[in-house]
């Protein structure tokens, strides 16, 4: 795990208004690879992607907000409000080489104003955490269990809890700066893209997963019979920093998506056997893919 300390003096000296900021939980800029796991457990690449986000506290606000990338030539890209975060998404690419050409390693500068920070510029520096090769972690492979036994993704019993496990997060590790260890995210959405289960995010006063976790339980009450659900597991390597009392993450991440199907007979009007809306655009299949 690579770590970098940004603006040491800003950390050591009084932060003024920034020391009591109450608007932002964290900001993140990252590169990600997205994959789909087939019913036979084969994992295939879908696309490569760049993203940046500003996550808000429950009563937090940020306006305006934009991002300067290494190739921006001074032209900032505005963030869009998703309802729970300010988001900026780059293109989706068929190869990691294309991703790197459009979003190279370097400084990604968040420009934003919030009531508790005022107008600030926050730098998140993306740099390959490995000495050579791809900085992206291996794509996780998902394993499903019910009643202590492996279960196929097409035959999930909605009356039982579903235990989700994944292949080892080999690149994950603890943060020597003790800001945040490398993270894991598990999400399950229904056929309409509504999130029904989430493993949590840091700094939201709820449990969340790190590289050290090995499994996540989806409760039976979150499953309906005769339905299809969209399941994802993300492994995220972090490079942490802190400015203006706001934590910043530079991340290289890999996500695997898997559709799961519940058995049984649904109540009238509750069956849904096909995905009507993807909950995450990372599932996009590129033309020719």
What are these regions (language model features)?
Residues 6-14:
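Bacterial N-terminal signal peptides
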Residues 19-46, 124-171, 269-288:
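Short, compositionally biased P/S/T/A/G/V-rich stretches that sit at domain boundaries
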Residues 21-98:
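Solvent-exposed N-terminal domain segments of exported/luminal and surface proteins
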Residues 55-69, 169-200, 226-230, 242:
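Solvent-exposed loop/turn segments flanking beta-strands in beta-repeat/beta-sandwich domains
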Residues 66-94, 182-224:
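Recognizes extended acidic, P/S/T-rich segments that occur
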Residues 92-110:
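Ligand-binding face of N-terminal immunoglobulin V-set domains in extracellular IgSF glycoproteins
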Residues 114, 221-244:
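Beta-strand-rich modules
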Residues 120-122, 238-280:
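Extracellular fibronectin type III
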């Amino acid at each position: 795990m690579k770590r970098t300390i940004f603006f040491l003096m800003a950390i050591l000296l009084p932060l003024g208004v920034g020391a009591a900021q109450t608007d932002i939980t964290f900001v993140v800029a990252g590169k990600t690879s997205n994959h789909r796991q087939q019913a036979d457990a084969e994992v295939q690449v879908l696309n490569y992607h760049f993203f940046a986000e500003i996550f808000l506290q429950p009563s937090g606000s940020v306006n305006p907000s934009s991002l300067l990338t290494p190739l921006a030539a001074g032209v900032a890209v505005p963030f869009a409000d998703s309802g729970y975060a300010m988001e900026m998404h780059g293109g989706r690419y068929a190869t990691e080489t294309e991703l790197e050409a459009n979003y190279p390693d370097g400084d990604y500068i968040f420009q934003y104003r919030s009531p508790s920070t005022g107008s600030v510029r926050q730098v998140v520096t993306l740099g390959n955490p490995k000495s050579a090769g791809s900085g992206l972690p291996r794509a996780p492979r998902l394993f499903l269990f019910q009643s202590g036994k492996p279960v196929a993704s097409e035959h999930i019993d909605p009356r039982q809890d579903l235990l989700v496990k994944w292949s080892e997060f080999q690149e994950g590790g603890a943060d020597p700066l003790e800001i945040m260890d490398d993270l894991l995210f598990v999400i399950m959405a229904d056929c309409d893209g509504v999130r029904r289960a989430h493993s949590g995010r840091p700094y939201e006063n709820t449990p969340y997963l790190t590289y050290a976790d090995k499994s996540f339980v989806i409760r039976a009450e979150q499953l309906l019979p005769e339905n299809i659900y969209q399941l994802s597991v993300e492994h995220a390597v972090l490079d942490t920093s802190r400015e203006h009392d706001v934590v910043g993450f530079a991340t290289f991440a890999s996500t695997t998506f898997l559709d799961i199907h519940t058995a049984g007979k649904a109540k009238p009007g509750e069956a849904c056997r096909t995905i009507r809306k993807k909950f995450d655009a990372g599932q996009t299949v590129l033309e020719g893919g």
